[in-house]
């Protein structure tokens, strides 16, 4: 994956990017060393108890004035066990979805402010 990312960056003419493989709860980078962090359907795969640590790590490595873009599926209410325990839905980033209020709390506790949310799908993909 790293090799492909480096290849794509090079073919796109990007010289100020780097990629590492690491645990999202313990990122081996210095404090305040990253300009921008992009996460696409990753945090949903982190166990619920570790999600606050993810946002603390993001805040730790982000430079002052840096930016974070996260794309994840969020739930409006608690997911039932039939969804949470479905491995296919876990792999599809659905079963690990946090509630919107939980996400906001994780971000605020990590010190983030000025957050903007874009809700791209207002309808539930699951019947009530």
Go through the PLM ranges and name each one:
Residues 52-67:
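A short glycine-rich, Lys/Arg-flanked "PGG" loop and its adjoining helix->strand segment in the class I
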Residues 12-26:
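Conserved SAM-binding strand-loop segment of SAM-dependent methyltransferases
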Residues 25-37:
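A short acidic, Gly/Pro-enriched loop at the edge of an enzyme's catalytic core
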Residues 35-49:
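A short SAM/SAH-binding and catalytic strip from SAM-dependent methyltransferases
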Residues 5-6:
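Conserved SAM-binding loop
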Residues 74-94:
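Short, glycine-/aromatic-enriched active-site segment of Class I SAM-dependent methyltransferases
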Residues 111-128:
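Conserved catalytic loop of SAM-dependent methyltransferase domains
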Residues 96-111, 117:
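Short alpha-helix
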């Amino acid at each position: 994956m790293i090799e492909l990312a480096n290849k794509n960056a090079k073919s796109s003419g990007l010289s100020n990017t780097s990629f590492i493989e690491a645990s999202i709860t313990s990122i081996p980078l210095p404090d305040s060393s990253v300009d921008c962090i992009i996460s696409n359907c990753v945090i949903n795969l982190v166990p619920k108890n570790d999600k606050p640590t993810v946002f603390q790590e993001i805040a730790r490595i982000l430079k002052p004035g840096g930016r974070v873009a996260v794309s994840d599926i969020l739930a409006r209410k608690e997911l039932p066990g039939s969804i949470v325990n479905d491995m296919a839905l876990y792999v599809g980033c659905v079963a690990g979805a946090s509630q919107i209020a939980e996400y906001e709390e994780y971000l605020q506790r990590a010190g983030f402010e000025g957050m903007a949310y874009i809700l791209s799908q207002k309808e539930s993909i699951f019947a009530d």
